[in-house]
Amino acid sequence: MSVLVQFRVKVPDVERFRAAAAKFEPVIAGLGGSNHRAFVSESDPNEVATLSEWDSHDAMMAATDRFGDDFNREAGTEGLEWETRIWHEL
């Protein structure tokens, strides 16, 4: 059964994050992620989140091991504290 993965982080540059999220969308899709979208918080203009579906938590971990460092460099999120939540359909 697939999982919905939520990543959340406060960023110094939302536009830079948005550009990286768009650039890496095909990479994520190529590694098995689907419905990848990025969002900004209504209550905090520097808080962003991404949501994407994966076949499993392990599949997401294997994929992010391959592109995560490059994404963080592009997005300006190196060294920032990310919150990760894995959601299972009821």
Predicted feature residues:
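Short glycine-/aliphatic-rich beta-strand segments at the starts of folded cytosolic domains
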Residues: 1-10
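Conserved RNP beta-strands of RNA recognition motif
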Residues: 7, 50-52
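Structured loop/turn residues at secondary-structure junctions
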Residues: 9-12, 55
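Short acidic-aromatic low-complexity motifs
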Residues: 11-15, 31
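Short amphipathic alpha-helices within nucleic acid-binding modules
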Residues: 17-20, 55-66
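Short amphipathic alpha-helix segments
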Residues: 18-30
